[in-house]
UniProtKB/Swiss-Prot annotation:
The modification Phosphothreonine is found at residue 2. This is Photosystem II D2 protein. Keywords: Acetylation, Chlorophyll, Chloroplast, Chromophore, Electron transport, Iron, Magnesium, Membrane, Metal-binding, Oxidoreductase, Phosphoprotein, Photosynthesis, Photosystem II, Plastid, Thylakoid, Transmembrane, Transmembrane helix, Transport. Chlorophyll a ChlzD2 binds at residue 118. GO terms for cellular component: chloroplast thylakoid membrane; photosystem II. One of its GO terms (molecular function) is iron ion binding.
Amino acid sequence: MTIALGKSSKEEKTLFDTVDDWLRRDRFVFVGWSGLLLFPCAYFALGGWFTGTTFVTSWYTHGLASSYLEGCNFLTAAVSTPANSLAHSLLLLWGPEAQGDLTRWCQLGGLWTFVALHGAFGLIGFMLRQFELARSVQLRPYNAIAFSAPIAVFVSVFLIYPLGQSGWFFAPSFGVAAIFRFILFFQGFHNWTLNPFHMMGVAGVLGAALLCAIHGATVENTLFEDGDGANTFRAFNPTQAEETYSMVTANRFWSQIFGVAFSNKRWLHFFMLFVPVTGLWMSAIGVVGLALNLRAYDFVSQEIRAAEDPESETFYTKNILLNEGIRAWMAAQDQPHENLIFPEEVLPRGNAL
C-alpha cells in the first residue's frame, strides 16, 4: 500500500478570500464590495439631511429659517449651501473654518458639503452594486449603465455647476422649495428652457414616460392566457412560468395605429432604455455648459440687443420680461451678501407702461 505525503490540493484561504466570501454571501440584503462604499455613504448622506432639515438654521449663510425647529414644513425645510464667501471650501469639520466646533460647522453650512459628497459617492456605490450583482448572476450590466444617467445629473447640478461658479453657494440646497428656487435661478440667469440640451432632456424624460405607459398598456391589452377572473387584477397570476402576451398581436395593433411598430422585443426594450438615459445625459452636459456660463441667451438675439441698447426697437418678448423679472427679484433676495439695490428705471416695466 502506498501513502502519498505532501500538501493538500486545497489551498489555504487568504484574508481577502474570507472577506470576499462574507461580503458576497447569499443573504436577504446583498452587501458586496460595493456595499462598503454604498451603505456608509448613504447612511451619512441621509442622516446629514435629516439632521439639517430638523435642527440647523440657514440664518448665517442665507438669512433664512430652514429647519423644522424654526417652524418650516416639509416643503420649506432644507440643508442650505454655505455662504458665498466660503467659495469652494470642503468645509471639513476639522478644517480652518470650523476648527472642530460642530455647532460652528453647522452654522457655516458644513452639512451641505457633507450631504453632497456622501450623496454622490452613495449613488456611485449603488451603481457599482448593480454591476457587482449583475456579474455575480451573469447578467449584462445595462441596469448600472442606465443608473449612470441620474448620477450624471446629480454630479453636474450639485457639484460641477457650483465649481464653475464662485462657490457652493450657487448650488441647489437640499430641499423641495430650494430646488424650485434653483430652477427659477437657472431660467432667469441662464435662460435654461431655451437651451437645446434642456430640450433634449425634456424629450427624453417625457418620451420615456410615454413609452412606459404605451408598453405597459400594450402588454396588458394582449394577454391571452390569463386567469378566470372578470377583473384583470384578480386574473393576474404573478407566478406563471411562461410569457402570456402576444407580441404579434401588439405589432399588428401598432402597425395599424402608427403605420410602424416594433417587431423585435430587444429593439423595443433597448429603445425604452436609450430614450431616458440619453435625455438625462444630454441635460447633464447642458448643465456643465452652464457651469462655464455658456448660456442660451445667444438663441434669443432680441434679449442680448435689448440688454445692450435700451433705445433699440426690439420685440420685448414675454421671455425677456420673465428673465429680467426673475433676475431683478432673485439677485437682491437670493444674494443678500451683494447688498444689491436696483434703481427704478432698470426694473422691468411690464406691458402696461
